[in-house]
From Swiss-Prot:
GO terms for cellular component: cytosol. It comes from the Bacteria. Transmembrane segments: none annotated. It holds the Pfam family NAPRTase. This is Nicotinate phosphoribosyltransferase. GO terms for biological process: NAD biosynthetic process via the salvage pathway. The keyword Magnesium does not apply. InterPro entries: N/Namide_PRibTrfase, NAPRTase_N, Nic_PRibTrfase, Nic_PRibTrfase-Fam, Nicotinate_pribotase-like_C.
Length: 434
């Protein structure tokens, strides 16, 4: 693939629209895996997704031009999966399985387009909402976040001259490469790119992926970004996300169904997938509650992805649970993915080395770390904590608690109800940076 001079590309904006989303494959692989499950098992469920900016001090509607945002969202709605992309999805091997996507699902997917959106402004923030069938609205999450983040980056760099941009990107590349050099010291470490949602830009994420591929070789497991995985002959990686238990819980008609919701979606998942895709995401309503009530068969799954507890503490609790269930943690897998950077990756790896198999999903601090790279401080280049979460399912409020109370989302009254129902054991309040 020819190299792009990112600084020159950023400076030379002579076209009417520079699309941020170039393909519907420019999304995370787990969205496609979940989409097939939703299409098969929940085709008639409605789900609303809402943009949530947890960094309240950043007033997005004052940094990003609303018309530019509309233009990018409208462009994304014109996209369809190409013939080449459909052939790749049908013929490629994912997680050791051929034809992981059924022909019937792919036939439906070939006709897919993103549904309409609702956009308004309130108190300096954008209110961006996607309503409709879950099987359609779910696909807005990743492109919406990528669009918002890249428009913010572009706005921050407007007016910068070509040499300033050269310096900015040269420093960012050097900073990224210094991290690569640290990771090289641990040849058994396994790193994946999980940086699509809050990336600086598509081109920068592509550069980071190519740098990891060359820089750490076999230690680079692949990318969650399907387009970049396809273009760079990498493994497309990802399992499942919080939206599955969030929707299942919202649809629960009584306390018994609410308690069973986190495990019901795992059973649904197991209908379609197996092996290395049997990864548990335990923290939607608190990891302690999940482990306390988990059926014994959950311990037979391949591994866990602790996503909001401090990695060492969260990992230790899962290892202790496996041992309690009579399983050997050395046969299991932990995938760490919450706010990681090279220091926390190395610290966590060294702590658990030899005790459990590990992989690290490196996200925002891989694809959006420009701190100290600009000749003068540019606040708009600092990453923010922004998510696009399910807010309703069939008209009922959806909630996510997590192990960090600051990451909770949902209607405040419903959040309080869930806290009382599931409890707050082992919750650790931490500053949410990304």
């Amino acid at each position: 693939m020819p190299k792009t001079d990112i600084a020159r590309r950023v400076y030379n904006h002579t076209w009417k629209l520079d699309p941020i989303i170039r393909s519907l494959l420019d999304t995370d692989f787990y969205k496609l895996l979940m989409l097939q499950m939703i299409w098969q098992l929940y085709p008639d469920v409605d789900a609303t997704f809402s943009l949530i900016n947890r960094t309240k001090t950043v007033r997005l509607a004052e940094e990003i031009d609303e018309q530019e945002l509309r233009d990018q969202l409208d462009h994304a709605r014109t996209l369809r999966f190409s013939k080449k992309e459909m052939i790749w999805l049908a013929g490629n091997t994912f997680y050791g399985r051929k034809q992981i996507f059924s022909p019937e699902f792919l036939s439906w997917l070939a006709r897919f387009r993103l549904p309409e959106y609702e956009l308004s402004r309130r108190d300096g923030q954008f209110e961006l909402t996607f309503r409709g069938r879950w099987v359609e609205t779910t696909m807005w999450e990743i492109p919406a976040l990528a669009i918002i983040n890249e428009l913010r980056s572009r706005a921050a760099m407007k007016g910068l001259g070509p040499f300033t941009l050269d310096v900015l990107y040269a420093r960012a590349k050097a900073k990224m490469w210094s991290k690569v050099e640290q990771l090289r010291q641990y040849p058994n470490l396994r790193i994946s790119d999980f940086g699509t949602r809050r990336r600086h830009s598509f081109l920068w994420q592509r550069w980071c992926v190519e740098a990891l591929k060359e820089g750490i070789g076999a230690s680079f497991s692949g990318s969650s970004n399907v387009l970049l995985a396809m273009d760079n002959d990498l493994e497309a990686l990802g399992t499942n996300a919080h939206e599955l238990p969030m929707v299942a819980a919202a649809l629960a008609r009584n306390d018994k169904e609410l308690a069973a919701a986190p495990y019901k979606v795992l059973q649904d998942w197991n209908q379609l997938y197996g092996g290395n895709l049997l990864i548990v995401l335990p923290d939607s309503f608190g990891t302690a509650a999940f482990l306390r009530n988990a059926p014994d068969w959950v311990a037979d799954w391949t591994g866990f992805r602790p996503d909001s507890a401090p990695p060492v503490e969260g990992g230790e609790k899962i290892l202790a649970w496996w041992k309690k269930k009579g399983r050997d943690p050395r046969d299991k897998l932990l995938i760490f993915s919450d706010g990681l950077d090279v220091d926390t990756i190395i610290k966590t790896y060294r702590h658990f080395e030899g005790r459990v198999r590990m992989s690290f999903g490196w996200g925002t601090n891989l694809t959006n770390d420009f701190a100290g790279c600009a000749p003068t401080e540019i606040g708009g280049l600092n990453p923010i904590s922004i998510v696009c979460k399910v807010s309703e399912a069939n008209g009922r409020p959806a909630v996510k608690l997590s192990d960090n109370p600051r990451k909770a989302t949902g209607d405040p009254a419903e959040v309080e109800r869930y806290l009382k129902f599931f409890g707050t054991e082992d919750f650790v309040e931490q500053t949410v940076r990304v």
